[in-house]
Amino acid sequence: MDIVKVFGDNLRKFRKARGISQEAFAELCGLHRTYISAVERCRRNISIENIQRIADALGVEAYMLLIEEENDNARG
């Protein structure tokens, strides 16, 4: 399991499920849009503080961003 990829995939999934653009989401988090884009694409590491900011903006518990989906695991 690549935790950075899992986090980025989950961030994108939760953000899109809420119909929020990267730009609008970055504003909600107080982060830059290019940072959100880089995290979603596994190009940037993320601090614990920013994980919490993102979780708060999404309205989810932080740990939910770190859980690999069953169907992703099956693909290997």
Spans of model-derived segments:
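Short, charged recognition helix plus adjacent turn
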Residues: 66-76
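DNA major-groove recognition helix of helix-turn-helix/homeodomain DNA-binding modules
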Residues: 50-64
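Recognition helix of helix-turn-helix/homeodomain-like DNA-binding domains
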Residues: 31-44
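Helix-turn-helix DNA-binding elements, focusing on the entry/boundary residues of the two helices
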Residues: 11, 22, 33, 48-51
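Short basic helix-loop element that most often maps to the first helix and adjoining turn
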Residues: 9-28
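Short, conserved catalytic or interaction motifs in soluble domains
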Residues: 41, 60, 70
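Conserved hydrophobic/aromatic packing and binding residues within compact polymer-binding modules
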Residues: 11, 25-26, 36-39, 65
